[in-house]
Swiss-Prot record:
Positions annotated as glycosylated: N79, N257, N1141
Motif Selectivity filter of repeat III boundaries: 1012-1015
Gene for this chain: Cacna1s
Family (UniProt): Belongs to the calcium channel alpha-1 subunit (TC 1.A.1.11) family. CACNA1S subfamily.
Taxonomic superkingdom: Eukaryota
The keyword Transmembrane appears for this protein: yes
Mapped I repeat ranges: 38-337
Reported modifications of this chain: The alpha-1S subunit is found in two isoforms in the skeletal muscle: a minor form of 212 kDa containing the complete amino acid sequence, and a major form of 190 kDa derived from the full-length form by post-translational proteolysis close to Phe-1690.
Protein name listed in UniProt: Voltage-dependent L-type calcium channel subunit alpha-1S
Residue stretches of each II repeat: 418-664
GO BP term (any one): calcium ion transport
Organism: Mus musculus (Mouse)
Record's subcellular location: Cell membrane, Sarcolemma, T-tubule
This protein's domain notes: Each of the four internal repeats contains five hydrophobic transmembrane segments (S1, S2, S3, S5, S6) and one positively charged transmembrane segment (S4). S4 segments probably represent the voltage-sensor and are characterized by a series of positively charged amino acids at every third position.
Length: 1852
């Protein structure tokens, strides 16, 4: 390839970074023939890489889009001249794009080498579009030729061309490749695709399960409706849609006279919405999940089969599908987006913004300093002047002579005055007074604009006009002053000033234009509203708000690219919609469909409507009907809408939220810096201004402030505010915490001590303590020691009392819900009234007791000083007053009765978790303050603009031909259903739209409903049709008005509302963390620790019985799994194949299949029961689930058999709902329908199979666990609102065709709750609001006075519904989202950090070592276990042995007396070291602190478990750490000896030297290493590297010296050929493991040719004794013989498997002293706990000279291994190695070792006699000396050290 020319280089430098057309490295040859020298290719390259070329192409694409948009689709392939012209133009575009593609292919090559044309995704897209375009043209030509030959076929042939032409709409996508910022957004969406795919699977799964359940339960139920008898006319009331009915049962009866219920109706929505077959069932379920129109479906089902239970189906569907699963999308997207943004941020964008701010501040400071300097100059000059004048001088006269001097003088004076004046002006402009004046003027301006309304009096209009001019003048003056005072440059530096200038100039321009008559006043009066933005000037002195605004402006950048993407998306779908549905939305019923695709603007609006999800289903139904209804081609239409809805609504709109959440965090980080400064100042003030307080108090204050300013985690305002809130919750704003109340246990948790010495647990009071009686007297009579008061205190603080009161609160709440709202004096209400007296009495007594105990309110800590107590008092007082006022004014009583609803709130004070959530909500509300302000301002501004645009224009006459109120009189005819035979006479009415813009308040109300996405299309079309004031609408009069609504929706509903939601989420997450702020564990650590404490080992059951084993083998094999999987899938398909009106044969087949599947699944259950035995089978929750399903299925089969039998025998129908000739389809036979569900539930088993979905499910359940208090709060909210609703709106009559009807009303409590649930999902809540406002018809049974039948409902409905909607939509549902995002952060988290999901692996692998789930394994197995688990939890198989040992020293699990470690302790130690939880510093202290933390967070942890996991202080546990520490020391000795040998070439003979050197290794090498291991400092990479190298170097040593403890004689290794023992276990599993492990070279060192310790031996599950005898570990290459013999003797000969023979058993028998009797002797002292700690037992040491000749004994390194293997190693001193009787660490050696350890910093180990002894043994072994020799040498050494030369007495 030729070198690039210099001009190429230059080009390359100049070219800015464009993603696609970068200069690609060009291949030497393109299309196999064109080289780089080829002139054609050279030309192509230069053109393609020419800068303007890209621009030209982009412009062409843009032009093409315009051409596509102008095209007018017509029905039936009609055309007009414009369309024909555009088709010609299409050829031009096609040619341009073809040329572009061809040139790029020539320049870059086509496909085969890197960077070829088709290697880029965008180019592939281009190529496909161009190719299809060319293909279409060819087809068209073919069609034309065909048409000429055979004119008949033209219609058919044209179709495929039309379909292909639709691909043109993808061209706008090419714009993406031209805009880099778009690609960030797209990238983050693409990155999120994988987790989104999992979620999509989960959603699909939900939809399938619910669709099949729907199919089973509601199949064919929707086809009956009310017809007039003998006709096909559907009987409906006015405004009512036809809906299903039921002849019998509890469905809807036909009430209209002369109507009957019969079948043959296609069904609701022209037969699209039903559950008759799987496809439509899925569509209906999906529509419900999208929360649009789900209530309609529910009400239809209710009408068809009764309302007892269908709500369960729909409500669970909404809760699971909409609230949970679909919010996962948000979790994933925001995670991905934040990551993408992090990358961008690391490039420093945000830093720049900060620096810029800093620079501006500096510059301002500098400018003001300079100007001040100038002024001072002036002052000095002035003073100088005067002195000159006073002195007087002749020279002045000389100046006077010259004429110039006066002018010069004047100019100089003028300059000085100008400077002074400008400085003064600058001061004035900068002063607070000026600022507040401006704010006042802005407020007046706002007032004058807001006072405009429809039909306002003339004087007001005049006043507004004058005010407008005056204010404009004032603003102009302000602007000029600023310009003069600050100088132009500094003035225009501020964005606000630029904006101000723009507003003022536009105002002046407006007045000039209106005065000169060049413009109508309206058009520009909208500009007047922009002045309202001036309100944002407040932000100048309000830092958090100004930062929020800055952050919003900042995120507008990221949102701009998203908007562009959204816009492209909308354009593409609008163009596609025009191709598909243009001109097709005209139906027979002559009703105009407003949301159609007949032209481009209209298509845009329709697509936007589907995107916001409002009524998208009705647009889809129209689309299906346009293609011939719910039959073959029509149904495919739904694909278009579903893709549009999913991509738009779920993905793009959630990215909005992701961006919002992201930018908020940034706004906070700006604020926090300023906050910190303020805190600093405050702290200084505080510490200065506390002279009267004691030192201690002052310290607490400053400490509090410090804590505040620190605020761990993301420093956000939310965080800081939360701190303030927490510290002020129970305080009267004083800096020290107030006394607590019994329920108020915020502060009574133990503080974790900060002192260096840990406090023992006893001092950390973990019990919730009662609040003491305050010092002051209560009611001035009861002193603190008064008997009565003490008794009251005891009662109030008793737990039974609290529970008793809670019970009464619950009962009284239930009584409220049970009231009958319609018949006020019914029997039920009278009984409840008596109950009410009882409740009130109890609550009054409670309050009196509490007041007696704590005093009323005069002193600190008294009853009324706590907000929650005041709430209690208020509730009780209301009850008492309402009882007293029974007779007086009704309205007051009514209000008071409604206030009783607050009773359940008293539970908050009693339940701690609930209280926390409520505080969370309060904090959230306070934090959201700023956002609410900004949103309200924007809303207000839009409302003002709306008033200008639409006031008085939303009137209409119901007879559309009349345009004004005068004309709209008399009667007019109407044809029912467009049928000319049915004529009806109706009176004309002049109607005002319910939502309108006649004044600012109603405008804000209308806009609020728009921002909730409910009913906005109707309002939009009203606005589009609006004409003049007080006249009727004109169809499509002002389409441009849609811009107002779309901008509003994007700005407020997409952006601000999402920021709102984002803020709530961020706040809740912060709040969740604050709860644990003092416990020093972050969320992940908490989760892992909790898992480690709660986890239990799995049973890995292998049956012993050979037949049972065969079954077990089959059941646990993977093939069996796959078979069941396939069967479940088949079952699903069979269930999905059922449909309504299926043939008899089909019915028969499905019945047979059902029986077959039931038999198969029963068989599976039986097999598993045989294999696992009942105990093992029911241990797994999935099996329990299986079992229930099988039982249910069997019942279902039996029932259906009985059914068919009864049906065939023609007998009575006796199932569900009594006997009688009942149509089986009619009655909602919950009995058999319920059992049918079991068929469907088998599907749920599939969830257990897919890994990703399983994790999703697991987290799902986790988030449910996190929700109890949130759920409780939601329940409370619903309860309170439902009861209020019953009291206020219960009397409204139910009228079909209105929103308060048979399915939707407030007459019973369950109905009220369902209605509220509907409002929470946003289903037409604004219409329910209108239906509950004043002036509605009353229920005939209610107690209204005559003539008052239209007085029900109340305008309180506005407050009621708006407050409920806001609470629900912005707080409650976001609680769901916050919890989910919290739990799902793992989807996008960093997998290298240990998290709870890693811990399952540990459980699974542990089970192989501990199949019986005893919870213990041999400590020697721990290393193998951990090497099998991958990091971050385990060590991984490539971890060198020494590093593994060092990590074990750091983990330091407690070791049981039988040499085992426990499950929880091991897991806990792993978690602790992996996450570095309290591993630094003094280990014992850290342990104690950690114990306290665990007790604080997990109060129910049993002390036994806690001691097992973290041994308490003073418990001289033997731990794995100490064991491996001796091992490491020994290794160092060995290395040291090796070095010695290499150095001297032989062994140095002098004992003392050797020992000294050995001790030095302890001190200098081993100790620091162990120290590091203990403090967990092992992560250093180089450490690992070094260890790996060392391991490799020492391979020789390892091999020679065998395994863990010292050298093993080679002859033993040769002869030790034990046969591997396999006791009927499954070879398959373990063989795999063994191969895997042996791949690692490091591993091989640990497996000498010794089959007995082969990994297979581990599987020795059934011979427990063999396990014990052999220690069964892959690390025991030298099964430490002495210890084994010893152990075997303990076990007794009988326990030994007899079959074992071989050299191993010989030495044991040979060794004389170790005969049975000897062991018995040794056993005796073991049973008593003997000597004081640390004292060496004399007996074994005195028996010197026992037979030590036996080679085995000499080599057996007893101590180190033994002190782990002997039972009861706590008093290890009692059984020192007795196998070699003289092997004792004698006093002198021990002293030296202790000294060395202390010097090495291992004091705790030095104090441990066991450890010292083991080390002494290791020292002797390494030096190859007898202990006596070591002792002699040691004594010599001590003599040299001590001055007297005598041996120092040894006291450990």
């Amino acid at each position: 390839m030729e070198p690039p020319s210099p001009q190429d280089e230059g080009l390359r430098k100049k070219q800015p970074k464009k993603p696609v057309p970068e200069i690609l490295p060009r291949p030497p040859r393109a299309l196999f023939c064109l080289t780089l020298q080829n002139p054609l290719r050279k030309a192509c390259i230069s053109i393609v890489e020419w800068k303007p070329f890209e621009t030209i192409i982009l412009l062409t694409i843009f032009a093409n889009c315009v051409a596509l948009a102008v095209y007018l689709p017509m029905p039936e392939d009609d055309n007009n001249t414009l369309n024909l012209g555009l088709e010609k133009l299409e050829y031009f575009f096609l040619i341009v794009f073809s040329i572009e593609a061809a040139m790029k292919i020539i320049a870059y090559g086509f496909l085969f080498h890197q960077d070829a044309y088709l290697r880029s995704g965008w180019n592939v897209l281009d190529f496909i579009i161009v190719f299809l375009g060319v293909f279409t043209v060819i087809l068209e030509q073919v069609n034309i030729i065909q048409t000429n030959t055979a004119p008949m076929s033209s219609k058919g042939a044209g179709l495929d061309v039309k379909a292909l032409r639709a691909f043109r709409v993808l061209r706008p996508l090419r714009l993406v490749s031209g805009v880099p910022s778009l690609q960030v957004v797209l990238n983050s969406i693409f990155k999120a695709m994988l987790p989104l795919f999992h979620i999509a699977l989960l959603v699909l799964f939900m939809v399938i399960i619910y669709a099949i359940i729907g199919l089973e339960l509601f199949k064919g139920k929707m086809h009956k409706t009310c017809y007039f008898i003998g006709t096909d006319i559907v009987a409906t009331v006015e405004n009512e849609k036809p809906s299903p009915c039921a002849r019998t049962g509890s469905g809807r009866p036909c009430t209209i006279n002369g109507s009957e219920c019969r079948g043959g109706w296609p069904g609701p929505n022209h037969g699209i919405t039903h559950f008759d077959n799987f496809g439509f069932s899925m569509l209906t379920v999906y529509q419900c999940i999208s929360m649009e129109g789900w209530t309609d479906v529910l009400y239809w089902v209710n009408d068809a089969i009764g309302n007892e239970w269908p709500w369960i189906y729909f409500v669970t569907l909404i809760l699971l599908g909409s609230f949970f699963i679909l919010n996962l999308v948000l979790g994933v997207l925001s995670g991905e987006f934040t990551k993408e943004r992090e990358k961008a941020k690391s490039r420093g964008t945000f830093q720049k913004l900060r620096e810029k701010q800093q620079l501006e501040e500096d510059l301002r400071g500098y400018m003001s300093w300079i100007t001040q300097g100038e002024v001072m100059d002036v002052d000095d000059l002035r003073e100088g002047k005067l002195s000159l004048d006073e002195g007087g001088s002749d020279t002045e006269s000389l100046y006077e002579i010259e004429g110039l001097n006066k002018i010069i003088q004047f100019i100089r004076h003028w300059r000085q005055w100008n400077r002074v004046f400008r400085w003064k002006c600058h001061d004035l402009v900068k002063s607070k007074v000026f600022y507040w004046l401006v704010i006042l003027i802005v407020a007046l301006n706002t007032l004058s604009i807001a006072s405009e309304h429809h039909n306002q009096p003339l004087w007001l209009t005049h006043l507004q006009d004058v005010a407008n001019r005056v204010l404009l003048t004032l603003f102009t003056i302000e602007m000029l002053m600023k310009m003069y005072g600050l100088g132009l440059r500094q003035y225009f530096m501020s964005i606000f000033n630029r904006f101000d200038c723009f507003v003022v100039c536009s105002g002046i321009l407006e007045i000039l234009l209106v005065e000169s008559g060049a413009m109508s006043p309206l058009g520009i009066s909208v500009l007047r509203c922009i002045r309202l933005l001036r309100l944002f000037k407040i932000t100048k002195y309000w830092t958090s708000l100004s930062n929020l605004v800055a952050s919003l402006l900042n995120s507008i950048r990221s949102i701009a690219s998203l908007l562009l993407l959204l816009f492209l998306f909308i354009i593409i779908f609008a163009l596609l919609g025009m191709q598909l549905f243009g001109g097709r939305y005209d139906f027979e019923d002559t009703e105009v469909r407003r949301s159609n695709f007949d032209n481009f603007p209209q298509a845009l609006i329709s697509v936007f409507q589907v995107l916001t999800g409002e009524d998208w289903n009705s647009v889809m139904y129209n689309g299906i009907m346009a293609y011939g209804g719910p039959t073959y081609p029509g149904v495919l239409v739904c694909i278009y809408f579903i893709i549009l809805f999913v991509c738009g609504n779920y993905i793009l709109l959630n990215v909005f939220l992701a961006i919002a959440v992201d930018n908020l965090a940034e706004a906070e980080s700006l604020t926090s810096a300023q906050k910190a400064k303020a805190e600093e100042r405050k702290r200084r003030k505080m510490s200065k201004g506390l002279p009267d307080k004691s030192e201690e108090e002052r310290a607490t204050v400053t400490k509090k402030l410090e804590q505040k300013s620190k605020g761990e985690g993301i420093p956000t305002t939310a965080k800081l505010k939360i701190d303030e809130f927490e510290s002020n919750v129970n305080e009267v704003k004083d800096p020290y915490p107030s006394a607590d109340f019994p329920g108020d246990d915020e502060e009574d948790e133990p503080e974790i001590p900060v002192s260096p010495r840990p406090r023992p647990l006893a001092e950390l009071q973990l019990k919730e303590k009662a609040v003491p009686i305050p010092e002051a007297s209560s009611f001035f009579i009861f002193s603190p020691t008064n008997k009565i008061r003490v008794l009251c205190h005891r009662i109030v603080n008793a737990t039974w009392f609290t529970n008793f009161i809670l019970l009464f609160i619950l009962l009284s709440s239930a009584a409220l819900a049970a009231e009958d709202p319609i018949r006020a004096d019914s029997m039920r209400n009278q009984i409840l009234e008596y109950f009410d007296y009882v409740f009130t009495a109890v609550f009054t007594v409670e309050i009196v007791l509490k007041m007696t105990t704590y005093g009323a309110f005069l002193h600190k800590g008294s009853f009324c000083r706590n907000y929650f107590n005041i709430l209690d008092l208020l509730v009780v007082a209301v009850s008492l007053i309402s009882m007293g006022l029974e007779s007086s004014a009704i309205s007051v009583v009514k209000i008071l009765r409604v206030l009783r609803v607050l009773r359940p709130l008293r539970a908050i004070n009693r339940a701690k978790g609930l209280k926390h959530v409520v505080q969370c909500v309060f904090v959230a509300i306070r934090t959201i303050g700023n956002i609410v302000l900004v949103t309200t301002l924007l809303q207000f501004m839009f409302a003002c603009i709306g008033v200008q645009l639409f006031k008085g224009k939303f009137y209409s006459c119901n007879d559309l031909s009349k345009m004004t109120e005068e004309e709209c009189r008399g009667y007019y005819y109407i044809y029912k259903d467009g049928d000319p035979t049915q004529i009806e006479l109706r009176p004309r009415q002049w109607i005002h739209n319910d939502f309108h813009f006649d004044n600012v308040l109603s405008a804000m109300m209308s806009l609020f409903t728009v921002s909730t996405f409910e009913g906005w299309p109707q309002l939009l079309y009203k606005a589009i049709d609006s004409n003049e004031e007080d006249t009727g609408p004109v169809y499509n009069n002002r389409v441009e008005m849609a811009i107002f609504f779309i901008i509003y929706i994007i700005l407020i509903a997409f952006f601000m509302m999402n920021i709102f939601v984002g803020f709530v989420i961020v706040t809740f997450q912060e709040q969740g963390e604050t709860e644990y702020k003092n416990c020093e564990l972050d969320k992940n650590q908490r989760q892992c620790v909790q898992y480690a404490l709660k986890a239990r080992p799995l049973r890995c059951y292998i049956p012993k019985n050979p037949y049972q084993y065969q079954v077990w083998y089959v059941v646990t094999s993977s093939y069996f799994e796959y078979l069941m999987f396939a069967l479940i899938m088949l079952n699903t398909i069979c269930l999905g194949m059922q449909h309504y009106n299926q043939s008899e044969q089909m019915n028969h087949i499905s019945d047979i299949l059902n029986v077959a599947f039931t038999i198969i699944f029963t068989l599976e259950m039986v097999l598993k029961l045989i294999a696992f035995k009942p105990r093992g089978y029911f241990g797994d929750p999935w099996n329990v689930f299986d079992f229930l399903i099988v039982i249910g299925s069997i019942i279902d089969v039996i029932l259906s058999e009985i059914d068919t039998f009864l049906a065939s025998s023609g007998g009575l129908y006796c199932l569900g709902g009594g006997c009688g000739n009942v149509d089986p389809d009619e009655s909602a036979r919950i009995s058999s329908a319920f059992f049918r569900l079991f068929r469907v539930m088998r599907l749920v088993k599939l969830l257990n199979r897919a890994e990703g979905v399983r994790t999703l499910l697991w987290t799902f359940i986790k988030s449910f666990q996190a929700l109890p208090y949130v759920a409780l709060l939601i329940v409370m909210l619903f309860f309170i609102y439902a009861v209020i609703g019953m009291q206020m709106f219960g009397k409204i009559a139910m009228v079909d065709g209105t929103q308060i009807n048979r399915n939707n009303n407030f007459q019973t409590f369950p109905q009220a709750v369902l209605l509220l649930f509907r409002c929470a999902t946003g289903e037409a809540w604004q219409e329910i609001l209108l239906a509950c406002s004043y002036g509605k018809l009353c229920d005939p049974e209610s107690d209204y006075a005559p003539g008052e039948e239209h007085t029900c409902g109340t305008n309180f409905a506005y407050y009621y519904f708006i407050s409920f909607y806001m609470l629900c939509a912005f707080l409650i549902i976001n609680l769901f989202v916050a919890v989910i995002m919290d739990n799902f952060d793992y989807l996008t988290r960093d997998w290298s950090i240990l998290g709870p999901h890693h811990l399952d692996e540990f459980k699974a692998i542990w089970a192989e070592y501990d199949p019986e789930a005893k919870g213990r394994i041999k400590h020697l197995d721990v290393v193998t276990l951990l090497r099998r688990i991958q990091p971050p939890l385990g060590f991984g198989k490539f971890c060198p042995h020494r590093v593994a040992c060092k990590r074990l020293v750091g983990m330091n699990m407690p070791l049981n007396s039988d040499g085992t470690v426990t499950f929880n302790a091991t897991l806990f130690a792993l978690v602790r070291t992996a996450l570095k939880i309290k591993t630094e510093g003094n280990f014992e202290q850290a342990n104690e602190e950690l114990r306290a933390i665990i007790k604080k967070i997990w109060k129910r942890t049993s002390m036994k478990l806690l001691d097992q996991v973290i041994p308490p202080i003073g418990d001289d546990e033997v731990t794995v750490g100490k064991f491996y520490a001796t091992f490491l020391i020994q290794e160092h000795f060995r290395k040291f000896m090796k070095r010695q040998e290499e150095y001297y070439g032989y062994r140095p003979k002098k004992d003392t030297v050797q020992i000294q050197a050995g001790l030095r290794t302890i001190e200098e090498e081993a100790a620091p290493e162990i120290h590091r291991a203990i403090s967990g400092d092992l992560t250093a990479e180089e450490e690992l590297e070094r260890a790996m190298v060392e391991a490799a170097m020492e391979e020789g040593i390892f091999r020679r010296t065998g395994g863990l403890f010292g050298q093993v004689d080679n002859f033993l290794e040769r002869t030790n050929s034990l046969p591997p023992v396999m006791a009927n276990q499954r070879p398959l599993q373990f063989a795999e493991i063994e191969m895997e492990e042996l791949e690692s070279p490091v591993f091989l060192e640990d497996f000498p040719q010794n089959p007995g310790t082969h990994p297979l031996a581990r599987a020795n599950t059934n011979n427990a004794n063999a396990n014990v005898a052999y220690g069964n570990s892959s690390h025991r290459n030298n099964p430490v013989f002495s210890s084994i013999c010893y152990e075997r003797e303990f076990l007794g000969e009988a326990d030994m498997p007899v079959t074992r023979e071989g050299p191993l058993s010989q030495p044991c028998r040979a060794s004389g002293p170790h005969s049975r009797s000897h062991v018995d002797k040794l056993k005796r002292p073991m049973t008593q706990r003997g000597m004081p700690e640390g004292q060496v037992p004399p007996s074994p040491c005195q028996v010197t000279g026992a037979k030590a000749e036996h080679p085995v004994q000499k080599e057996g390194k007893g101590p180190t291994s033994r002190f782990l293997e002997t039972p009861n190693s706590r008093n290890f001193e009692e059984h020192v190695p007795r196998n070699s009787a003289h092997r004792c660490t004698a006093p002198a050696t021990a002293m030296l070792i202790q000294e060395a350890l202390v010097r090495g910093g291992l004091d705790s180990l030095a104090a441990d006699a066991n450890f010292v002894m083991a080390t002494g043994q290791a020292l002797a072994d390494a030096c190859q000396m007898e202990p006596e020799e070591v002792e002699v040498a040691a004594t010599e050494l001590l003599k040299q050290e001590s001055p007297e030369g005598g041996a120092v007495p040894w006291e450990p």
